[in-house]
Amino acid sequence: DRLAPQGLDALYHALHLRALAEVHEARAAAGRGLIAGSMGPLGESYRPDLTPPVEVSAALYAEKARILAPHVDLILIETISSLDLARGALKGARSTDRPVWLSVSVQDRDGTKLRSGEPVAALAGVLAETPADAVLANCSMPEAMSAALAALKPLGLPFGAYANGFSEIEPHTHGTSAPAYCARHDLTPERYADFALDWVAQGATLIGGCCEVGPAHISHLHQRLRAAGHEIA
């Protein structure tokens, strides 16, 4: 939905196929790995007030999922900031036969709440309607993730987190733009790994990094996990 305002909507399918071809090349070079087909938020990220109705979002996500499904191992719904957007995305993703992971973005100062203000725990009702195969929290500050994971764990699914490296993203409900934020300079690879190992201690088995968490962070996290005796699939 961000290509259309730029007059690039006709490239939607081709751009997906180009990205999918490149990720298959990367996996072949690495010799291992799962390919997750990403489906992000509709409208502006971090603006749950701009979420389209469920029937609209479900159709848009189904279109995307059908493009991705033949080329990926799983569908990853990510940076979801409201219960209704989760409903639409899950319905769309389930139009394919691929496993579906649902990842939500939480408030930076209260990881028990989605950016909409709705409780993370309320995902239980959404998942009862349309199931997922795993649940995660992403694209929020690492400081918020422990609380988010505590709310996700009782859902009874594999769970995890991949935080961002942004400054606090404050609620914003004016106009149609995204809230202001910037990259942090205090989130070193060592500090990010400290957070991530705490998530593992909570039982999380799906760990990674989102925006502004780069290769150096992931490389150091890999080393720390190995050193702690964890197996990395």
Regions found by a protein language model. Give the residues of each.
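Domain-level signal for soluble alpha/beta catalytic cores
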Residues: 1-233
